[in-house]
């Protein structure tokens, strides 16, 4: 009897195949294919195919394929942990950027030696080519099989809650499934609750490394047990893993926490508390330069500057919805203004006051403070507003995740007719300013509606999303979709910037809001006299000053361009007798607001130069006998190159020019390119100034 056939579409091409086929047979000739996208859903290669299916191949080196490989590596790690620690109870194990983690409940924390042992067990499991096999199970079967895994039982019983968290890697809204690891004889050697998909077998995991272990609360809540989390990375090839490790070594050298201490920029005193930074004079100089330029650009782009208090009555956040949606991220209330008589009876009711977590409610009150006309729109409000968010102590990280942060916060109110032009101008403004700070490699991410969680009409969501997409496409930048990733109140574009070593940072966000104008009953008078709701746009260009400071510090590895550098010019006299001449020049720079220092210590000249070089200052200004006799100074740059005998007036003009142009200068060549041709009789070259 002839084998029955089915009609399917494979990578866009119609095919007739045997009814019993799976992706394994369909793609048997291409070992780089490790999974399929079946009717739009990622599935294992072993998934049976049916008539009418649309099948797309997924290769190991694709984003989807790499994610599947990393999740399979998570299972291999969990299996290895339970071999090494049989009493370990399983939490969850999602994929994260570059790798994965898994949470375990164990008696003793994992040590570096434990990680080495676990890696060896993983290597053995990988070499044994264990096959991943999926089984659909009922809730009763899952509870029975996971009887010794209390955290898995919790996920099974609370499926709906689990779907809203990283536990969704284990739980599907459709069905429950187990994944068995089978040895070459087909025996089950390990199992885990998981929605999948997974690799055909473990040998597809070519390059991995366990990085570290850390404590983590179950489901991220301090009310839950403390678990041990193991982090790992995995890549399709060993070369990619090696390249990643090289990048991480460079990232460690650029760590803003390390550089901040070495360069005396900021600190986190224990007396103040976690996530609350203090900026030292040099760090504050950088902050001031960042803010000054931002203010200048906002003035040029017709923003109105506002200022709002740090605390407010809780009723404002009831109106905005923050107390409903965001209370866990807010500091506890302060009950104030209550008055009692001598008997303790309340004679005047008090109010709960909160530290503000966001500036937008107060900006809405400014908009609402009087009647608005369409002639006033677009109205662009801007503030460097400090906000306070209660981040768990285990989450705070240097300046990138803090509890007190200052946002360069803007809220734009416009008509629907103005929305496209406003968004276009806003994106161009954001990109221009980011480029001036030295970030030039961008892509955009468009977060669209979650069909199950949104406010506002489908019509306005569609209009706003299409408008954002048009604006993004007109920018010429790569646009990456984030389906369902928008907040409930509106779609968003985020600007993702790559730094000097290729890492991606989310910097600016442009967020439409259909919620707050309704909650605050914001209105303007339209040309026909009717009352209309404005379109509201949230925009944070830096995100926060603190986080953007950290990004720039790591991007430049502390070697800021002169306009941002905490010390822009450092004077080093060759000998004491030349100090007065040098001091006169440095004072003239300071009169023009150049940030200067002079090393008048007792150190020998060579040591002063070495110390100056370590400080990453853009311009080391040297004065020796020839400089003094010719009323000149010499420059030494970060790369060790030197420019000698520059007349003081020309030297000052060049320094001011490079600061004004906001260019990076690390060498003589950079300096020449920034300032044009040097004056007559001035030579560019390298001089030996390290001699004692």
Curated annotation (Swiss-Prot):
It catalyses: tRNA(Thr) + L-threonine + ATP = L-threonyl-tRNA(Thr) + AMP + diphosphate + H(+). PROSITE patterns: AA_TRNA_LIGASE_II, TGS. The keyword Ligase applies. Its EC number is 6.1.1.3. One of its GO terms (cellular component) is cytoplasm. CDD domains: TGS_ThrRS, ThrRS_anticodon, ThrRS_core. Disulfide bonds: none annotated. It is found in: Cytoplasm. GO terms for biological process: threonyl-tRNA aminoacylation. Signal peptide: none annotated. The keyword NADP does not apply. Binds 1 zinc ion per subunit. It comes from the Bacteria. Its cofactor is Zn(2+). Keywords: Aminoacyl-tRNA synthetase, ATP-binding, Cytoplasm, Ligase, Metal-binding, Nucleotide-binding, Protein biosynthesis, RNA-binding, tRNA-binding, Zinc. Zn(2+) binds at residues 360, 411, 538. It is an enzyme of class 6 (ligase). InterPro entries: aa-tRNA-synt_IIb (IPR002314), aa-tRNA-synth_II (IPR006195), aa-tRNA-synth_II/BPL/LPL (IPR045864), Anticodon-bd (IPR004154), Anticodon-bd_dom_sf (IPR036621), TGS (IPR004095), Thr-tRNA-ligase_IIa (IPR002320), Thr/Ala-tRNA-synth_IIc_edit (IPR018163). Residues 2-59 form the TGS domain. GO terms for molecular function: ATP binding; metal ion binding; threonine-tRNA ligase activity; tRNA binding. Pfam families: HGTP_anticodon (PF03129), tRNA-synt_2b (PF00587), tRNA_SAD (PF07973). Homodimer. Belongs to the class-II aminoacyl-tRNA synthetase family. Catalyzes the attachment of threonine to tRNA(Thr) in a two-step reaction: L-threonine is first activated by ATP to form Thr-AMP and then transferred to the acceptor end of tRNA(Thr). Also edits incorrectly charged L-seryl-tRNA(Thr). This is Threonine--tRNA ligase.
